């Protein structure tokens, strides 16, 4: 179905809905993006007047008004009608055209005697890849002709190390003012290499540029003195034009800067991979809040940092934080009496806390020992009364001197001069067996204070009680010599 010229001057949506037949709404303008693909399909086709037909001839529809009709493009040859030059029709093609046209670049200064071939292969580089225009592809090929490949070893220029893809990126940026990342260049190289290898596998004919490109990708430029001098002359000039180069070889973009005096972070460089607007906004807000807030103490600064991080929450403590200014700690004035009194109070409170902690530790130690006695199967019911004395071990104070420790009595549990193991000691009563040891004067002197008084009253006052004690059974000198209690 044909469209009238007046339809483009009115509401298009309303007029298109009124049609019930087939509508051709796709037009191809010469030199457009899609035209490059069609020219590659028909490189030698010549558009004639017969290639364009009227709408009446295709749809076989008699129109009432015979105004000049739009010509539909036939067989995809890219013919353009003069009627498409109207402002209403031309507006539909402006969005599809490339907005940034790359200026024409002459490479005769660097490659004398070489002229760019205008073959179908050059035109096919732009097919399906809007980011790699013809100018960028030419700069890409020029960079490959300059850079010599040396395995994985980087090239040192101006005290900085650069890889091949990074140098290609710099050259493209310098020549076309369009930036390509190292990852984009690496992918582009792999695509070209795979495409050419597939052509070789299918026994297809390669053009001269494809052969040259495959050789440059695999082997790089020829390593001659002339090529080396040309390489360093060009890339030293490119690197000198850059703002700065760090020691690691990473470049500082021209338009990327962090202003401490400004209100935030400005990121406008085309040398960087574009970041999302949300991340950029977070960075700017963080810089603004960080510059605005002047933390008086490290605690306030840490609180400010954690409050701005997702997943963290600052809960106010019960004790108020002392607002100390950092200048107070660095004053050269002598400390007054108030500062000494504060230090003295702090030391006293620390001692009290230490005493309380020792009491708590001793309490839980006694509880754990009592529980161990109860769970010990060797511990009989007849000796339960003695476990109380065993659990009440004397706690050596931390402030005890060496002389006090040396003057402490020797333990009364003897095993040929060696103390018994802990499991055996805790399973036995406090008083020794056999009872004849109680009459030994040296033994009484070796007991602690509270045990000495206990045995003085209990054993020495009524020795007849132990004359016929059942513990005297099976008492032999051998048992006495070994110090066994049973």
UniProtKB/Swiss-Prot annotation:
Other observations noted: Present with 530 molecules/cell in log phase SD medium.
Polar residues biased stretches: 472-486
DNA-binding region, residue range(s): 125-199
Gene3D superfamilies assigned to the protein according to its UniProt record, in alphabetical order: TEA/ATTS domain
Signal peptide residues on this chain, from the entry's feature table: none
Entry-linked PANTHER family: PROTEIN SCALLOPED, TRANSCRIPTIONAL ENHANCER FACTOR TEF RELATED
Superkingdom in the source lineage: Eukaryota
Stated name of the protein: Ty transcription activator TEC1
Annotated source species: Saccharomyces cerevisiae (strain ATCC 204508 / S288c) (Baker's yeast)
Family annotation (PROSITE patterns): TEA_1, TEA_2
Residues modified as N-acetylserine: 2
The UniProt record lists the keyword Cell membrane: no
UniProt-recorded Gene Ontology molecular function terms: DNA-binding transcription activator activity, RNA polymerase II-specific; DNA-binding transcription factor activity; DNA-binding transcription factor activity, RNA polymerase II-specific; RNA polymerase II cis-regulatory region sequence-specific DNA binding; sequence-specific DNA binding
Gene Ontology CC: nucleus; Tec1p-Ste12p-Dig1p complex; transcription regulator complex
Job of this protein: TEC1 is involved in the activation of TY1 and TY1-mediated gene expression. It is not involved in mating or sporulation processes.
Family of the protein in this entry: Belongs to the TEC1 family.
Residues with the Phosphoserine modification: 325
Chief place where the protein resides: nucleus
This protein's record includes keyword Ubl conjugation: no
Stretches the record annotates as Disordered: 372-410, 465-486
Keywords: Acetylation, Activator, DNA-binding, Nucleus, Phosphoprotein, Transcription, Transcription regulation
Biased composition (Low complexity): 377-388
GO biological process, one term: regulation of transcription by RNA polymerase II
Localization, UniProt: Nucleus
Gene: TEC1
């Amino acid at each position: 179905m044909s469209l009238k010229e007046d339809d483009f001057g009115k509401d298009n949506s309303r007029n298109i809905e009124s049609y019930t037949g087939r509508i051709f709404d796709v037009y191809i303008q010469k030199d457009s993006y899609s035209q490059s693909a069609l020219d590659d399909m028909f490189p030698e086709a010549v558009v004639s007047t017969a290639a364009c037909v009227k709408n009446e001839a295709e749809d076989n529809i008699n129109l009432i008004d015979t105004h000049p009709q739009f010509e539909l493009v036939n067989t995809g040859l890219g013919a353009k009608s003069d009627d498409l030059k109207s402002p209403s029709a031309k507006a539909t093609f402006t969005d599809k055209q490339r907005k940034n046209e790359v200026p024409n670049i002459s490479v005769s200064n660097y490659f004398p005697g070489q002229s760019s071939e205008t073959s179908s292969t050059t035109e096919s580089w732009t097919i399906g890849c809007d980011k790699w225009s013809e100018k960028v592809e030419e700069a890409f090929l020029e960079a490959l002709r300059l850079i010599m490949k040396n395995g994985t070893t980087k090239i040192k220029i101006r005290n900085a190390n650069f890889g091949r893809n990074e140098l290609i990126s710099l050259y493209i940026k310098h020549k076309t003012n369009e930036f390509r990342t190292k990852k984009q260049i690496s992918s582009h190289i792999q695509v070209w290499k795979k495409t050419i290898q597939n052509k070789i596998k299918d026994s297809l004919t390669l053009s001269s540029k494809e052969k040259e490109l495959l050789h440059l990708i695999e082997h790089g430029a020829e390593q001659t003195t002339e090529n080396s001098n040309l390489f360093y002359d060009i890339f030293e000039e490119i690197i000198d034009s850059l703002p700065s180069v760090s020691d690691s070889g990473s470049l500082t973009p021209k338009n990327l800067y962090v202003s401490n005096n400004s209100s935030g972070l400005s990121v406008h460089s085309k040398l960087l991979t574009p970041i999302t607007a949300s991340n950029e906004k977070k960075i700017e807000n963080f810089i603004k809040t960080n510059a605005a807030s002047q933390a008086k103490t490290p605690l306030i600064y840490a609180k400010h940092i954690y409050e701005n991080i997702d997943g963290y929450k600052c809960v106010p403590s019960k004790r108020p934080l002392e607002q100390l200014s950092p200048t107070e700690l660095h004053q050269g004035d002598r400390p007054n009496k108030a500062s000494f009194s504060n230090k003295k109070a702090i030391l006293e409170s620390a001692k009290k806390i230490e005493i309380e902690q020792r009491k708590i530790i001793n309490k839980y130690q006694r509880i754990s020992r009592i529980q161990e006695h109860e769970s010990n199967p060797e511990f009989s019911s007849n000796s339960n009364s003695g476990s109380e004395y065993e659990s009440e071990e004397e706690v050596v104070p931390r402030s005890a001197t060496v002389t006090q420790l040396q003057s402490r009595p020797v333990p009364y549990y003897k095993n040929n001069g060696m103390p018994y193991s802990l499991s055996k000691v805790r399973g036995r009563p406090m008083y020794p067996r056999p009872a004849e040891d109680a009459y030994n004067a040296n033994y009484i002197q070796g007991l602690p204070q509270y045990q000495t008084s206990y045995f003085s009253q209990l054993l020495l006052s009524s020795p007849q009680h132990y004359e016929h004690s059942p513990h005297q059974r099976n008492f032999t000198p051998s048992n006495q010599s070994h110090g066994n209690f049973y």
